[in-house]
Amino acid sequence: MEVRTVEGGFIGKGLRMGVVVARFNDLLTGELLKGALDCFERHGVEEVDVVKVPGSFEIPLVAKKMAESGRYDAVLALGAVVRGETKHFDLVANEVAKGVANVSLDTGVPVIFGVITVEDELQGFNRAGVKSNKGFEYAMAALEMADLMRKMEE
């Protein structure tokens, strides 16, 4: 029996990346963006376009526009949703997750869900720079998926 395993790598040379980032909760999203850009630079990505949107809820529409453009090998969606006293947190978090997944499925372009959902700002800071930077990790997923899709087309 012959088994062929296909995996994506982390070499960014020749890849074009799109990033859509929410301005709301910018103390957190700004750090996620820094982490993502650091990752892309360290892995040789030469072309990155960053588009800023008002909040996380607006991410799927812009991610779709970017994915449909044919310009990007992957799109990274960055945002931060912090729980408040109302159900707004659950509604936004769920709809953004569904929207991002649908964009990826509808376009065939990897769209990475890089929206942190946290109970409070301290938890957010722990995910966006103090203990680790999820932006870097999400960018790694974008690299891997872009390379995987390229390999699957060979």
Swiss-Prot record:
Q: Which cysteines are joined by disulfide bonds?
A: none
The residues that hold 5-amino-6-(D-ribitylamino)uracil are 24, 56-58, 80-82, 113
Annotated pathway? Cofactor biosynthesis; riboflavin biosynthesis; riboflavin from 2-hydroxy-3-oxobutyl phosphate and 5-amino-6-(D-ribitylamino)uracil: step 1/2
Record GO terms (molecular function): 6,7-dimethyl-8-ribityllumazine synthase activity
Which cellular component terms (GO) are annotated to the entry? riboflavin synthase complex
Residue numbers binding (2S)-2-hydroxy-3-oxobutyl phosphate: 85-86, 127
**Which keywords, in A-to-Z order, does the entry hold?**
Riboflavin biosynthesis, Transferase
As its record notes, the protein acts as a catalyst of: (2S)-2-hydroxy-3-oxobutyl phosphate + 5-amino-6-(D-ribitylamino)uracil = 6,7-dimethyl-8-(1-D-ribityl)lumazine + phosphate + 2 H2O + H(+)
InterPro entries, alphabetically? LS (IPR034964), LS/RS (IPR002180), LS/RS_sf (IPR036467)
The EC category is transferase
Catalytic residues in the record: 88 (proton donor)
Question: What Enzyme Commission number does this protein have?
Answer: 2.5.1.78
**A Gene Ontology BP annotation from the UniProt entry:** riboflavin biosynthetic process
**Family under the similarity heading:** Belongs to the DMRL synthase family.
Q: What does this protein do?
A: Catalyzes the formation of 6,7-dimethyl-8-ribityllumazine by condensation of 5-amino-6-(D-ribitylamino)uracil with 3,4-dihydroxy-2-butanone 4-phosphate. This is the penultimate step in the biosynthesis of riboflavin.
Name it: 6,7-dimethyl-8-ribityllumazine synthase
Q: Which Pfam families match?
A: DMRL_synthase (PF00885)
